[in-house]
């Protein structure tokens, strides 16, 4: 295959508005500097206790939990473009206000609001891709967005740590500006893709909840999220508990970012040739295996190797859930279906640290094999509903 043909297989055939969304997503993630450092900001810059910091972080998770169904409803009701742009503008304003808030009640309320608005763009973004991209190209398109998110976030982690030395307020302003750029790009360059009113059917969130196949998919993803998110919640605690320095966790997670940035674009188009449910199940299983072998790791290199295993599983899952949701959702309910899917991640974000840290304290020898079993359970569940997903996809293609 020629170089041109190779590049065409990876990025060709996608409409211009998709690339605007891709670029805006990348810019937005370049500025994602507040969330990763919010715990350090609260304890060091604002002098907040660890207990209060935990409360503030919980409010952020609660806000995210509330935002997904609401944003999904707005996406279908008002439109994709206005929901995404409105969410970005609201996030920018909240970031700036939060950066100058000093009282604990203000921080609690501010983080709740931030949790509501910061990810409100997700259902709209997913619906735009579903509206614009053909079913056969959706796994590739969602995979490219996944790559943009991870590449931007990797840069933001490094840049945010450096900029924080100049004062944490800078992080809030950078985050706000990149949110505004994303919102402006969408408003100016992406047309509204929601089905015309005369073509759209009436629909309610209750209609989504009656879709047993979608509910089964969401429950399986929730189980998977409980496993995957341990890499960001319980794993650093387990490593420091083994006497490893904080830098060891940073090195292990650098392996995660490097593998995603390098491997995922190379495999994205190739994986799209296979059945989505089987690839997703393989990814769930490999993530489970990666966390299970964490129980064998006692050094920085050992943990980095375990992270490499579950990162390869993460690469397998890139883009596929969004494509499955798009295939399951009727056009007039795409926002709400995407919101329900996002709800599984928001719930996982709340539950993962609670479950993981308690297991680590009560049964440190069982925590990683148990999460490995959860990953395999999610894989089996995905295989069980795979035939029904294929049948529904064929009907909606």
Where are these regions (language model features)?
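Conserved MFS/SLC helix-loop-helix module at the cytosolic interface between two early adjacent transmembrane helices
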Residues: 66-102
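Residue-level signature of mid-helix packing/kink "hotspots" within the transmembrane helices
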Residues: 33, 61-69, 153-154, 257-265, ...
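Helix-loop boundary and gating motifs at the non-cytosolic
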Residues: 16-61, 215-252
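Juxtamembrane intracellular "pre-TM" segments in multi-pass secondary transporters
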Residues: 1-15, 191-220
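C-terminal membrane-cytosol helix-exit motif in multi-pass small-molecule transporters
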Residues: 177-196, 381-386
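Structural signature of the two symmetry-related core transmembrane helices
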Residues: 82-96, 278-293
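Cytoplasmic helix-loop-helix junction between adjacent transmembrane helices
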Residues: 110-149
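Helix-to-loop junctions at the C-terminal end of transmembrane segments
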Residues: 67-79, 263-276, 360
